[in-house]
Amino acid sequence: MAEANGKITQVIGAVVDVQFDGQLPAILNALETENNGKRLVLEVAQHLGENTVRTIAMDATEGLVRGLPVKDTGGPIMVPVGDATLGRILNVVGEPVDEGGPVEATQTRAIHQQAPDFAAQATASEILVTGIKVIDLLAPYSKGGKIGLFGGAGVGKTVLIMELINNIAKVHSGYSVFAGVGERTREGNDLYHEMVESGVIKPDDLSKSQVALVYGQMNEPPGARMRVALTGLTVAEQFRDATGTDVLFFVDNIFRFTQAGSEVSALLGRIPSAVGYQPTLATDMGAMQERITSTKNGSITSIQAVYVPADDLTDPAPATTFAHLDATTVLSRAISELGIYPAVDPLDSNSRILDPAVVGEEHYQVARDVQGILQKYKSLQDIIAILGMDELSEEDKLTVARARKIQRFLSQPFDVAKVFTGSDGVQVPLEDTIKSFKAVVAGEYDHLPEAAFYMVGGIEDVKAKAQRLAADAA
């Protein structure tokens, strides 16, 4: 087919109208034009009539003028995939942004793909150990599952996702892909340098790197922020299909994907739905989330940070995301205000695989006992606030004392938060976590002070800290 050429007729911010003489390009096709000597990619969003298409720009449109020639590439945005992307930072259209020269890829892949059909999907459940006590015990992650980290502004989503990258990606033998969607450029820069330091990215020999980075940060136009998650996912899908291994796919932040979709929707003149979001919110989210799945070839384990506007979990953006996830880790401002980090809410967080058939009877029972004590403490808090601790029965006083110890024991120092805490991070094996909490619930450590349980690893660390505290007091 002869390639179609058109010209720009109108530019409104990130929306560009292009008129063609002959064949109109299909919806989602990529068009190319030149802006100030740089390639600018436009994605077709609507057919308007009079041989005109309305497109969304994937980069800044300053400098475009009416009459500029545009050519149709004949297909969707194609990005480089495979080993050539390892150790590199790409943008939404697959161009390198790390000053490391062109990406020498032998393969490219369209960013819009169909989700695997039912017959191709795999359903095995196996726990993915993170080394973080509160997660492994109460809301365990599954290999090949979708995991969401929900939280408002400043409660520690990015720190938690960085720690998960630190704990899982560094010891993970396969590949990882990190998609930075509408977040701070500084954080993306820090992550790259951290990965170089830890040897996950090897700048001297990129072929030995284990991670590919795809960034579309806060300063990008909405078109780029809306599509960059798909670019990252496309790179991850190729690793899954080609290597047959478990690929880790980190997204920070999935809310920005929805937010960018809402901006684009308004620019295209669609009537907004609830709270000003796009009417296609569930469709957009579903089209992306259904592609993140495990097939008979390999699996993608995705960990997604989800910003919660105004700490309201019923907001349409986080509420739509909930439906797609296997495990949800909810970060709570009330817990972060107590100084307990990670500020995971042990009663709000849950997981599909917290089931005796998957994690075993002992793990399941300990997790439920811990939640039971914390739930009882929560229901007693009103009485304590009004009447004080003295009015409680002896049994309730014991429950409160244990709950406060458990609450503090769920905190843990992180490697990536060393600058804040001044102490080295700790990773706790799952067996230790279960054994430690089982003993605390049973009352074996009722004699130790609350402070000994704060910011430590396993129960041995608690005993050592209690001895130190006793020595200091003496």
Swiss-Prot record:
Keywords: ATP synthesis, ATP-binding, Cell inner membrane, Cell membrane, CF(1), Hydrogen ion transport, Ion transport, Membrane, Nucleotide-binding, Translocase, Transport. InterPro entries: AAA+_ATPase (IPR003593), ATP-synt_VA_C (IPR055190), ATP_synth_F1_bsu (IPR005722), ATPase_a/bsu_AS (IPR020003), ATPase_alpha/beta_chains (IPR050053), ATPase_F1/V1/A1_a/bsu_N (IPR004100), ATPase_F1/V1/A1_a/bsu_N_sf (IPR036121), ATPase_F1/V1/A1_a/bsu_nucl-bd (IPR000194). Its main location: membrane. It is found in: Cell inner membrane. GO terms for molecular function: ATP binding; ATP hydrolysis activity; proton-transporting ATP synthase activity, rotational mechanism. It is a peripheral membrane protein. CDD domains: ATP-synt_F1_beta_C, ATP-synt_F1_beta_N, F1-ATPase_beta_CD. SUPFAM superfamilies: C-terminal domain of alpha and beta subunits of F1 ATP synthase, N-terminal domain of alpha and beta subunits of F1 ATP synthase, P-loop containing nucleoside triphosphate hydrolases. ATP binds at G151, G152, A153, G154, V155, G156, K157, T158. GO terms for cellular component: plasma membrane; proton-transporting ATP synthase complex. Pfam families: ATP-synt_ab, ATP-synt_ab_N, ATP-synt_VA_C. It catalyses: ATP + H2O + 4 H(+)(in) = ADP + phosphate + 5 H(+)(out). F-type ATPases have 2 components, CF(1) - the catalytic core - and CF(0) - the membrane proton channel. CF(1) has five subunits: alpha(3), beta(3), gamma(1), delta(1), epsilon(1). CF(0) has three main subunits: a(1), b(2) and c(9-12). The alpha and beta chains form an alternating ring which encloses part of the gamma chain. CF(1) is attached to CF(0) by a central stalk formed by the gamma and epsilon chains, while a peripheral stalk is formed by the delta and b chains. This is ATP synthase subunit beta. It comes from Paracoccus denitrificans (strain Pd 1222). The gene is atpD.
